[in-house]
Amino acid sequence: FLSVWNEAAEEGARGASVDNINTLFVACLSATGTETTLTEANPAAPVAPAVIADAGLTATQLAIKATIKKADDSYRIRFMTPVRSKIGITIAARVPTSYVATDVEAQIREAILAEYGQAAAASRRGYNRPLYQRVYALLKQKIVALSGGNADLVVTIQDVPTMAGRPELWRYVAADSLAVTVAT
């Protein structure tokens, strides 16, 4: 996960401060996963990121800092803890009786988790927000049972206003935040 933002985005999320002038903010989690993260269990109760002191930076964070400094050494760089936040998605599908409901349910889960799960490329960038249009198109493209004229699909994506403009959020769909029902 990697998210980099400037003082305007930071002040949009947490208010103005003179400490933010000429600062780039970074929240990251490397492949080794040694960086500290916070978890937001309830999106209606936001968890604020913590500032990571320079002495507590990991090798990955130090490499990111060096790369930014090499490109432009006029910026101050402040690392923040990423905040994990699961995206709740509910999918209700109706398919023709010629399909096995449990098989279609497994295909839906596989498609959503591949596209929006924790390991997905889209989730590893900041500001991940599944859009209804993309979810419907993805499911109809990947799952034959949903592409026919006798299939129906209803998708509900949890969207909490407090999530808007929070660049430190690592948002992804998890197996336990995805509810799927399929009827024939």
Language model region names:
Residues 100-184:
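An aromatic-glycine-centered, glycine-rich loop/turn in mixed alpha/beta architecture
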Residues 1-129:
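Carbohydrate-recognition loop of C-type lectin domains
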